[in-house]
Amino acid sequence: MDLKWQDAEEIAIRLAEGHPGTDPLTVRFTDMHAWIVALSEFRDDPTKSNEKILETIQMAWHEEYLDSKS
């Protein structure tokens, strides 16, 4: 599956799998951006992200993180 910036849920799942135990609220957006564009399935323009998109992905990842803790 090719991932684009709008695929927040899928990106969040990939980040949770790739960085287990990492609290996404402690990750800087610059690091998260780098991790996202490094995903093998990511096929979007790296310059097309913005703070709102990254916040959406961060919150989706945070939900995955909380689910893994319960």
What residue spans do the PLM features occupy?
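A charge-rich, low-complexity, intrinsically flexible signal that marks solvent-exposed coils, linkers
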Residues: 1-70
